[in-house]
From Swiss-Prot:
Function description: Probable lipase.
N-terminal signal peptide: none
Modified residues (N6-succinyllysine): 63
Protein name: Isoamyl acetate-hydrolyzing esterase 1 homolog
Species the sequence originates in: Homo sapiens (Human)
Gene Ontology biological-process entries: gene expression; lipid catabolic process
Active site: 24, 196, 199
Residues at the site labelled Transition state stabilizer: 56, 89
């Protein structure tokens, strides 16, 4: 006898989803101690955290691929929240890194376009969190550039312009925003948050998670624990506990 026939299947369990969309800082976020891994751990049995980070990508490319990642479907397929975290590559200096560089005005327009696309597939602004690029430690990043045989291709002051543009898009569109560029420089030497001047160190991952979680928590606080706690499973007939709606 098939397993489903023997026990009765119950309704399919559909996990809510949190989608992280961004560049390498998102792609690497599932490494040990990463901010994405911390989110997944915090939300286990409540929500799947999907990593859709693409190392080296800018908003021009992100805008093109977003419709391939999220399409209009039934309400159960709609992510409970989406983070959009770009700017580290867009803000590269045009003369030194023309492939990744995106003009400031286009960067803002691309962010706005992505927020508008999400709205068109029934993900409203209140489910979207924009994240500004992190500050750049120029001395550390220049060392990496020299190793790769190139000149310093980013400046923190320029990154700040892109961070401000991200803040303005969030204000215009009505989304939440996490201003990492400002927060990381607020009280101490921010270089400790960065492993190579650009990407996050363990301390930087912890910093991002601690500031992002309150924004995420507002959007997932009503999610129940999926399936009962083990002590609450009916001993004689576990099917009574395990084939219901799982809201325990």
């Amino acid at each position: 006898m098939a397993l489903c026939e023997a026990a009765g299947c119950g309704s399919a369990l559909l996990w809510p989803r949190l989608l992280l969309f961004g560049d390498s800082i998102t792609q690497f976020s599932f490494q040990q101690g990463g901010w994405g891994a911390s989110l997944a751990d915090r939300l286990v049995r409540k929500c799947d955290v999907l990593n859709r980070g693409f190392s080296g990508y800018n908003t021009r490319w992100a805008k093109i691929i977003l419709p391939r990642l999220i399409r209009k479907g039934n309400s159960l397929d709609i992510p409970v929240a989406v983070t959009i975290f770009f700017g580290a590559n867009d803000s590269a200096l045009k003369d030194e890194n023309p492939k990744q560089h995106i003009p400031l005005e286009e960067y803002a327009a691309n962010l706005k376009s992505m927020v508008q696309y999400l709205k068109s597939v029934d993900i409203p602004e209140n489910r979207v969190i924009l994240i500004t690029p992190t500050p750049l430690c120029e001395t550390a990043w220049e060392e990496q550039c020299i190793i790769q045989g190139c000149k310093l291709n980013r400046l923190n002051s320029v990154v700040g312009e892109y961070a401000n543009a991200c803040l303005q898009v969030a204000q215009d569109c009505g989304t939440d925003v996490l201003d990492l560029w400002t927060l990381m420089q607020d009280s101490q030497d921010f270089s400790s948050y960065l492993s190579d001047g650009l990407h996050l160190s363990p301390k930087g991952n912890e910093f991002l998670f601690s500031h992002l979680w309150p924004l995420i928590e507002k959007k997932v606080s009503s999610l129940p624990l999926l399936l009962p706690y083990w002590r609450d499973v009916a001993e004689a007939k576990p099917e009574l506990s395990l084939l219901g709606d799982g809201d325990h």
